[in-house]
C-alpha cells in the first residue's frame, strides 16, 4: 500500500464532504484517512442483545430496542422545535427525539414498520426517551449484521446533533476499508510475532474495527497495545543510546582521598542497601566515557542528600567542580547548611549563591569559581546567570527538577566545554510504569528503603467535630517543646475563598493559642516573597511554635523539631500532596503525627485517599494508588502529556504489556543497536515513519 494514500484529507473519503470534514476535524481531530483509521472504538456492543422497553434502566448506556414508530409530532420549545416519535414494542412505549434534521427524518421514516433503535436513554416525567437514535429497519439490520460485536466510537454531542452518529462513523470506516483494498505492512519482526504469538497487523486492524468474535477482538487489542508501547519504549531507549554514544562525558576514573576519607571515617550513619546500590550505579556512570543522565528517586527522608554529596566528592577527587541547584532559596540554604556540616572534616570549599547574595560576596564567588578554588556551589536558578562561570564543572545536580523549565536546565549543559554529568533528584515518587514511559530515556535509580530506626509517622483521620480534642493534642505537644504545622488547601479556582478559610483558621487558632505563651507564624501565597521567607525562617529557628500556612510549604524544608502536621480539609488534597506534606514532619528523633481533618461528607475517591494515607507511609505504594485515581496525564501534568497521549494502551491497566514491550525493545537493541539485521527491517522502517510524522500512530500502516 502507498503510505501517502493514508495522508489523504478526510473530505475526499466518499460520504464525508466539506461540512462533515469540518466537524470531524474540530470534534475528533480527524484530518486524514490515517486519523480515521486510528479512531479506535471505546467499547463494543453485543448486537445480538435487545432490550424490552419495560426492562430499560434510567440513564442507561447504549441499548438496542426493537419496536414500531406509531406516531410523529413536532413540539415547540424555547429555541426552535423538536421532532418526537412514539416508539412501541409489545410491552411498552418510549419516545425517540430529534432536535434538528426534522424534514429529512419525517420524509424517510415509515410509520408502523419495525425498526431497531440504538442509543442512550433518558428518563423524564415517567417516560423513557432516546435522543438522536441510530435507526435501521429490522430487515436491513439483520441482513447487514456480519458480527455480533458493534464498535462504539468516541463521539461528542455536537457530532450526534449534526447527524454524525455511531452508525455513520461505522459506515465511513467500511468505506475506508473498501478503498484501502491491500493489506497493511507488518511493523514488528517475525521473531516477536512468533514468540508472543501476536496477531498479524492486517488482521489486527480489521478486527479492531470489524471483530469476528470476542476471542479475535481480544487478540487484536493485545497486538495493537503491545505495538504502541513497544515503539514508545524503542524511541526512549534509542534516545538514551544516541545520547550515550554522541555526548561524551568526563571519565571519573579515580575514587580518591575525599571520597574514601568521608566514606570510611566521617559518614554520620551507616548507608542503607539501597543507598549503596545507587552509589554504585552512579560510580559506574561517572567512570564511563558517556555523560551521565540519571534520575534519582527517593521518598522523603530516604537519604538522597548523602548520595548527592558522595557523587560530588567523586567529581572533586578527579579535579572537577560540582554544583547543586534547588528551586527555592530556603531549600538552597538548607542544602548548604547540611552539606557544609558534613564537609567540615574535609578540605573542601563550598559556597551558596541565591538572588539575595550580596554583590561583594557574589564577586568573590565568581572569582573563586573561575580559578577553581571553589569546589561546590549550591544555589537557586542564580547559578544559571551568564556571569557564573566554572573552571571545570564536572557534575550538576538538580533537586526537584520538575520545578525548572527545559531551557533553564539546558543552561547548565553549557557551563563547560563538554556537558557535565547530570543527576536529577526528586522526592516525588513516580510509579515504575509511569517512570518507564515518561523518563524512559534517563537511567533511573531508586532509593526504596528508609534508614533503620526512623519512627513511622502516625497518621490519623479526624472529623471537624473532633477539633477540640485535636487542639488539646497540639497544646500537649507544644508543652513538650515540639512545633506544629497547620495547613489549609489552596485551589486556584476559589483562591478568595481559600484565603478566607486560612484567615478564619488563623483567627480561631490565635484565640485558642494566645500570646505570649504561643507564637504563631502565617504563610500564604498573597504575601511578598521576603515576608514569606521571614516567617518561614522564624519557624525554622524555633521562634514560633505553630505555622499556619497554605500549601506553600516547600518540599524539602527541614525542621527536625516539627513533629505534628495538621491538614485541614484533607479531602481537597491529592494523594501526592498529602504525602509530601506529611513528609515535613518526622525529621527528628521524636514520634511524629499527621492529622487529616475533614467534614463528614466525603466522596468515594476522598475516602480512598484518606484510607491510603492512614494505611501506608510507602511513597511508591501511594503513587500507584494516585495513578489509578487520577490517571497518568493528570498526575504528570501537561508538560508530559504528549508522551502519555496513548491511542489504545492504558499505562494503569496495561502495566504487564508495558513491561513485556520494554523488555523486547531492550533485547532488540542489545542484539542489533542500529537495527540493521534483515529480521528487524520492519521495525527499522516503522521507526523511520515515526521520525517522519512525529507521531507514534502515523506509522500504523
Which role fits each region the language model picked out?
Residues 1-14, 26, 232:
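Long, highly charged, low-complexity intrinsically disordered interaction regions
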Residues 22-23, 249-296:
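Conserved pre-motif I regulatory segment
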Residues 39-66:
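OB-fold nucleic-acid-binding modules
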Residues 75-266, 671:
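Upstream accessory/linker segments immediately N-terminal to the RecA-like ATPase cores of bacterial MutS
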Residues 134, 138-141, 395, 411-413, ...:
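N-terminal cationic and glycine-rich segments that engage phosphates or anionic surfaces
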Residues 277-280, 291-611, 671, 701:
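Inter-lobe coupling/hinge segments of SF2-like helicase ATPases
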Residues 537-547, 552-560, 565-568, 583, ...:
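Accessory helical-bundle/CTD segments and flexible terminal tails appended to RecA-like ATPase motors
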Amino acid at each position: 500500500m502507498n503510505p501517502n494514500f493514508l495522508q489523504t484529507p478526510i473530505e475526499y473519503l466518499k460520504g464525508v464532504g466539506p461540512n462533515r470534514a469540518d466537524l470531524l476535524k474540530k470534534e475528533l481531530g480527524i484530518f486524514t484517512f490515517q486519523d480515521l483509521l486510528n479512531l479506535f472504538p471505546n467499547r463494543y456492543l453485543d448486537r445480538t442483545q435487545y432490550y424490552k422497553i419495560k426492562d430499560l434502566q434510567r440513564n442507561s448506556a447504549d441499548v438496542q430496542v426493537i419496536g414500531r414508530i406509531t406516531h410523529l409530532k413536532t413540539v415547540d420549545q424555547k429555541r426552535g422545535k423538536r421532532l418526537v416519535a412514539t416508539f412501541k414494542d409489545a410491552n411498552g412505549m418510549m419516545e425517540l427525539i430529534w432536535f434538528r434534521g426534522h424534514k429529512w427524518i419525517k420524509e424517510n421514516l415509515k410509520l408502523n414498520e419495525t425498526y431497531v433503535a440504538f442509543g442512550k436513554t433518558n428518563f423524564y416525567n415517567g417516560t423513557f426517551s432516546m435522543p438522536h437514535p441510530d435507526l435501521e429497519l429490522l430487515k436491513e439490520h439483520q441482513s447487514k449484521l456480519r458480527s455480533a460485536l458493534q464498535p462504539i466510537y468516541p463521539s461528542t454531542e455536537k457530532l450526534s446533533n449534526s447527524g454524525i452518529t455511531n452508525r455513520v462513523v461505522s459506515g465511513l470506516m467500511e468505506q475506508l476499508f473498501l478503498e484501502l483494498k491491500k493489506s497493511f505492512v507488518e511493523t514488528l519482526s517475525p521473531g516477536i510475532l512468533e514468540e508472543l504469538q501476536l496477531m498479524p497487523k492486517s488482521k489486527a486492524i480489521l478486527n479492531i474495527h470489524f471483530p469476528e468474535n470476542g476471542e479475535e477482538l481480544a487478540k487484536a487489542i493485545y497486538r495493537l497495545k503491545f505495538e504502541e508501547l513497544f515503539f514508545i519504549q524503542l524511541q526512549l531507549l534509542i534516545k538514551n543510546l544516541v545520547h550515550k554514544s554522541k555526548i561524551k562525558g568526563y571519565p571519573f576514573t579515580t575514587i580518591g582521598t575525599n571520597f574514601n576519607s568521608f566514606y570510611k571515617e566521617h559518614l554520620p550513619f551507616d548507608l542503607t542497601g539501597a543507598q549503596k546500590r545507587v552509589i554504585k550505579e552512579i560510580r559506574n556512570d561517572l567512570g564511563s566515557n558517556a555523560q551521565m543522565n540519571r534520575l534519582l528517586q527517593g521518598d522523603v527522608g530516604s537519604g538522597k542528600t548523602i548520595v548527592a554529596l558522595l557523587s560530588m566528592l567523586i567529581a572533586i577527587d578527579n579535579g572537577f567542580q560540582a554544583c547543586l541547584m534547588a528551586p527555592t532559596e530556603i531549600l538552597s540554604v538548607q542544602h548548604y547548611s547540611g552539606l557544609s556540616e558534613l564537609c567540615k572534616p574535609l578540605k573542601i570549599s563550598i559556597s551558596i549563591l541565591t538572588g539575595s547574595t550580596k554583590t561583594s560576596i557574589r564577586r568573590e564567588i565568581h572569582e573563586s569559581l573561575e580559578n577553581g578554588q571553589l569546589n561546590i556551589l549550591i544555589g537557586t536558578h542564580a547559578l544559571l546567570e551568564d556571569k557564573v562561570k566554572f573552571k571545570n564543572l564536572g557534575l550538576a545536580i538538580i533537586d526537584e527538577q520538575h520545578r525548572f523549565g527545559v531551557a533553564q536546565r539546558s543552561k547548565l549543559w553549557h557551563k563547560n566545554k563538554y556537558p557535565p554529568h547530570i543527576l536529577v533528584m526528586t522526592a516525588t515518587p513516580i510509579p515504575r510504569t509511569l517512570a518507564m514511559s515518561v523518563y524512559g530515556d534517563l537511567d533511573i535509580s531508586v532509593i526504596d528503603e528508609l534508614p533503620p530506626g526512623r519512627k513511622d509517622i502516625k497518621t490519623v483521620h479526624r472529623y471537624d467535630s473532633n477539633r477540640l480534642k485535636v487542639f488539646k493534642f497540639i497544646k500537649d505537644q507544644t508543652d513538650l517543646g515540639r512545633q506544629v504545622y497547620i495547613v489549609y488547601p489552596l485551589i486556584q479556582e476559589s483562591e478568595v475563598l481559600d484565603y478566607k478559610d486560612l484567615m478564619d483558621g488563623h483567627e480561631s487558632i490565635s484565640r485558642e493559642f494566645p500570646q505570649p505563651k504561643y507564637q504563631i507564624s502565617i504563610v500564604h501565597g498573597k504575601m511578598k516573597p521576603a515576608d514569606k521567607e521571614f516567617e518561614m525562617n522564624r519557624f525554622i529557628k524555633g521562634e514560633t511554635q505553630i505555622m499556619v500556612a497554605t500549601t506553600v510549604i516547600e518540599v524539602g524544608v527541614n525542621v527536625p523539631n516539627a513533629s505534628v502536621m495538621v491538614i485541614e480539609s484533607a479531602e481537597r488534597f491529592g494523594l501526592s500532596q498529602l504525602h509530601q506534606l506529611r513528609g515535613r514532619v518526622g525529621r527528628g528523633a521524636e514520634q511524629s503525627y499527621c492529622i487529616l481533618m475533614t467534614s463528614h461528607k466525603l466522596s468515594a475517591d476522598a475516602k480512598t485517599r484518606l484510607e491510603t494515607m492512614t494505611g501506608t507511609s510507602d511513597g511508591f505504594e501511594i503513587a500507584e494508588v494516585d495513578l489509578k485515581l487520577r490517571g497518568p496525564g493528570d498526575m504528570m501534568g501537561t508538560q508530559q502529556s504528549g508522551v502519555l497521549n496513548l491511542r489504545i494502551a492504558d499505562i494503569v491497566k496495561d502495566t504487564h504489556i508495558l513491561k513485556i514491550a520494554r523488555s523486547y525493545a531492550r533485547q532488540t537493541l542489545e542484539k542489533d543497536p542500529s537495527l540493521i539485521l534483515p529480521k528487524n527491517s520492519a521495525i527499522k522502517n516503522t521507526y523511520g515513519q515515526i521520525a517522519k510524522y512525529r507521531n507514534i500512530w502515523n506509522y500504523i500502516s
